[in-house]
């Protein structure tokens, strides 16, 4: 893999996907160092991807699904501002939650953040609906994750 291809991948991929990937890998992180890399590294890679895409002419990232064209990445100046805010918040959440030792809570927190960032950058209503619902599902599991009587109420 060359540096140019890596830079192209970062610039043309929805930044939320990097946080979602970190969320999916978190349950398999067994030690503190790997958890820290995923909890903070996922949002930082998303931040690098967002900044590297600023000012470039980005090709829309589209996928054909059931006869529909899903636009998975459509950056503009407004989504840049909101995406930047979401990514910074998710990095701060990652740093703040390093004191916990619960892989489920960490994973659902990053899943929620990644789905929120993904929703900011998608370019069609179907993809927006999917990302929005993923935030709803992640928030339910975030509430239930502590597995205590308070979370069941």
Task: Report residues per predicted region.
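Transmembrane helix-loop-helix hairpins at membrane boundaries of multipass inner-membrane proteins
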Residues: 2-107
């Amino acid at each position: 893999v060359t540096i140019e291809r890596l830079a192209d991948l970062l610039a043309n991929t929805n930044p939320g996907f990097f946080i979602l990937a970190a969320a999916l890998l978190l349950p398999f992180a067994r030690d503190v160092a790997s958890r820290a890399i995923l909890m903070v590294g996922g949002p930082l890679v998303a931040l690098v991807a967002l900044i590297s895409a600023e000012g470039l002419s980005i090709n829309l990232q589209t996928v054909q699904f059931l006869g529909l064209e899903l636009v998975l990445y459509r950056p503009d100046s407004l989504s840049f501002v909101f995406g930047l805010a979401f990514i910074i918040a998710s990095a701060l959440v990652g740093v703040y939650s390093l004191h916990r030792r619960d892989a489920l809570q960490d994973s659902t927190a990053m899943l929620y953040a990644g789905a929120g960032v993904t929703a900011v950058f998608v370019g069609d209503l179907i993809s927006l609906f999917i990302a929005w619902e993923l935030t709803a599902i992640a928030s339910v599991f975030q509430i239930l994750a502590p597995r205590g009587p308070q979370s069941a109420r």
